[in-house]
């Protein structure tokens, strides 16, 4: 089989039994199971959730998105070899470490395959929970233009690009387009302040005001667990994005949990520690791919200017990226995953066929 065959690019066409539309995100697709199948799996697999909890199959792809677009490579390479398996392996490892440290639960109930999670339905918080330990990226771009207030936080004078911040900062943004919130534009990924959340906590999905403190605590705790573990590997945990939601426990009590992925090269910046001490930035995250794109195309403003989105979409659609650039990303993702987990990352030759086989034989979910 060719390299392209080993990439799972389309993940929303699996013959999984469902009575609802498949939700297709940039990287993952979600198949909501029937009530009958959800109840059967909860009973037969012994999942520690109420018997009427809706379950879903979440399938990751190898697609790569940057600047809100999906990119592809030469030779009909529609994704990054090993990327999906690497991302899931990293998240699985961190969620396990969270459990060992007594942090909150995640939405994951079972891992049938390197590309697949069985998850419980959650009521999502509509906040991208971003934590920053270093000034770089969008924060540095704003700071270098003279802005000193970022997400309601006043930054000190005299900061330099890529330096460690005096303290860990929480700089949230909106998750999805939210309407009717005073002072918050109805756009995706808009920076917001803690005071915005406090004044409109229900609009952001919080069930009670005290949970704002809880989400910040869980964010800081999760950041510290990952940062401490990466430091032992001489890697710098620069910044990251977490997501949270509510589920009910077996007693019907609502609880806040971690959702989506955590501490991955997609959701975080990770720098090589040795290089950083020498004054250089070596990216072990998707940021390296973003920088490649900014240098690869003649007009980088297309990638940065939200008013040029149609041009950006055409740029991504009409350009095959060099194979070596795609494989560099593959090596980065697999390398980080193997460092973090201490294990090799299995790369199926035909991931779609493998997923169908497992879900048919072990879960009876294939039609």
Swiss-Prot record:
CDD domains: SAICAR_synt_Sc
Catalytic activity: 5-amino-1-(5-phospho-D-ribosyl)imidazole-4-carboxylate + L-aspartate + ATP = (2S)-2-[5-amino-1-(5-phospho-beta-D-ribosyl)imidazole-4-carboxamido]succinate + ADP + phosphate + 2 H(+)
Any GO BP annotation: 'de novo' IMP biosynthetic process
Gene Ontology terms for molecular function: ATP binding; phosphoribosylaminoimidazolesuccinocarboxamide synthase activity
Disulfide bond annotation, renumbered to this chain: none
Annotated keywords: ATP-binding, Ligase, Nucleotide-binding, Purine biosynthesis
GO CC terms in record: cytoplasm
Gene3D superfamilies assigned to the protein according to its UniProt record, in alphabetical order: ATP-grasp fold, B domain, Phosphorylase Kinase, domain 1
The protein's Enzyme Commission number: 6.3.2.6
Keyword Nucleotide-binding: yes
Pathway given in the UniProt record: Purine metabolism; IMP biosynthesis via de novo pathway; 5-amino-1-(5-phospho-D-ribosyl)imidazole-4-carboxamide from 5-amino-1-(5-phospho-D-ribosyl)imidazole-4-carboxylate: step 1/2
Similarity field: Belongs to the SAICAR synthetase family.
Record-given protein name: Phosphoribosylaminoimidazole-succinocarboxamide synthase
